[in-house]
Amino acid sequence: MKQYIFFLALIVLTATFAEAGKKTEILDKVKKVFSKGIAGVADLNNMSELGCPFIEKWCEDHCESKKQVGKCENFDCSCVKLGGK
């Protein structure tokens, strides 16, 4: 009995989306958002691979001028003092 109710509800939902013509529009929007998200992650990955050596070198030079050691993580430069003297 539960299976019949489930399939009946599924048919009603499918018919509702098909009649309104929204089924393909909703799927297209979801696909566009998903593809934009994937492209954004790929772009961010490419930028970090290309930009990290330059930013890390700048960070090391910046912290060296303060007589500290620099470390770059996720485009964030942090300087740390070595020793207590």
UniProtKB/Swiss-Prot annotation:
This protein's GO CC annotations: extracellular region
Keywords: Disulfide bond, Ion channel impairing toxin, Neurotoxin, Potassium channel impairing toxin, Secreted, Signal, Toxin, Voltage-gated potassium channel impairing toxin
Tissue specificity note: Expressed by the venom gland.
UniProt key word Secreted: yes
Cysteine pairings via disulfide bonds: 52-72, 59-77, 63-79
Positions of the pro-segment in this chain: 21-37
Pfam family, one: Scorpion_toxin_alpha-beta
Residues annotated as signal peptide: 1-20
Keyword hit for Disulfide bond: yes
Family, per entry: Belongs to the long chain scorpion toxin family. Class 2 subfamily.
Domain comment, as recorded: Contains 2 domains: a N-terminal domain that is unstructured or forms an alpha-helix in presence of membranes and a CS-alpha/beta C-terminal domain, which consists of an alpha-helix disulfide-linked to antiparallel beta-sheets.
Name of the protein described by the UniProt record: Neurotoxin beta-KTx 14.3
Source organism of the structure: Lychas mucronatus
